[in-house]
Amino acid sequence: MHETLQEYLSRCLRISKSQADKNMDTKEFLKEKMREFFIKESNDGANPICSKEELVEFLEDGYLILDYFQKSKNFNNFFSLKDDELVAIEQPINTKILENVNFMGFIDFIVRSKKTGRYRITDFKTSTKGWSKYQKSDPIKNSQILLYKKFYAELIGISPDIIDVEFIILKRKVAEVEDFTIPRISKHVPASGKPSINKAWKGFSEFVESVFDSEGKYRTDVEYPKKPSKLCGWCEFFERGLCDGK
C-alpha cells in the first residue's frame, strides 16, 4: 500500500496529478506489489502468510483507500500540488548510537514547502480501523517519527525547528454511520518541539544502554522480566518458543 501511494504522490508532485491519474493504474500497481510481497513472504507459496480470501480482502480494502485518496478534495487535505516539493521517498537513516550500534530506518515521504522552506516528514500507517486516542498518545509510536526528525536534521545539516512531522493513517475498515461520513484516511500530528524530541531521545538512549554495553555487545548482567499482555502473540520470542507469554 505504501509503495503505491509513494509512487502516485511522486508522479503528482514531480509531474502533475492529472497526468498521474491518467497514466498510472494505481490498483494494478497495488495488486502487483501485493502479489510480489505474498510470493516472497510465503516462500513461493510453500508457506502462505494468509488465505486467498484474506488476500483478496486486503486488496479490496486497498482499492477503497486509493479511491478515497485520489479524489482531489481528499488529496488536498494532505498534500499541496502548488506548495509541496518532493524531497525524498524511503529516505535511509543510519546513525551511529554506540560502537557497533546504529539506528537504522527509512522515512516514508519527505516534502519541502516552496513558500516557507519548512520540511515535512510523513509516515504512512495502515490500520484496521484507525488509531484510538490511546494509540495516538503512545510514546513508542510517536518516538519513532520524532527520532526520524532528529536524525534527518543531523543528516542534512539543518535545524530540527524547520521540520514538521505527521502520521497519515490509512483505515482498512470504516464504520457506516448514517449522519456523517467517516474519513478513510486521517492525520495525526504529534507534538514535536524540542522537549518532545529530548524526551524521545532520552527514552531511546536508556533503552539502548539497558541492552548494549559500551562496545555494542549485548549485556548479560541484566535480567529482563517478561510483561505478559495481549501483544504477546506478536512477539518474536513467543513465536520462537523462548517465552510462554504467561
Where do the language-model regions lie?
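RecB-family 4Fe-4S metal-dependent nuclease core
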Residues: 1-246
